Amino acid sequence: MAWFAANIPDGSVQVVFHPASFGKHGHFGGDDASRAAAFVEYANDPRLDAVWFARGGYGSCRIAEAVLPRLTAVARKKRYLGYSDAGSILAMLYKAGFPHVAHGPMSSDSVRNDATAWRAINWLRSGDPSSWEPSLATDPRPAVGFNLSILDALVGT
């Protein structure tokens, strides 16, 4: 939160962490039901413009199928950004036709104090194409990025 306060002092971007983000359940960030409920709550909240995954999403594959049927039209309008195991949820959203899904930096990466956090914020705010992989700007084909281990698990190789 300090990075956001220091770098966006006008408050034009506000970051809200769901209380479940700080949960503990074994090596997971909370039990599956709590994590699924938190994701659905924020995805369906019309006051929020985007969902930016906080960390790697370890265990997101365990909740991905449970959350999809609970997402509303509000959730479909949001932008979603994350990487690593969060790719399980990103893949599910992409497959379901959610138009604004990207594999990229997480909010926890902002502490690196480099351009990646700014590119992520600009994409989350407006879909700014300068934040994309450069080849995507001229290639009209759909493109999806994944952690290779997650992609391997998703396709079953």
Regions found by a protein language model. Name each.
Residues 59-61, 89-90, 152:
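Short, well-ordered alpha-helical microsegments
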Residues 48-50, 76-80, 140:
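Short active-site oxyanion
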Residues 98-156:
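Conserved anion/nucleotide-ligand pocket segment
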Residues 1-47:
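ATP/NTP phosphate-donor binding region
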Residues 68-92, 100-106:
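Short, acidic/small-residue loops that bind anionic groups at enzyme active sites
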Residues 63-64, 92-95, 113-115:
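Short acidic, glycine/serine/threonine-rich loops at helix termini
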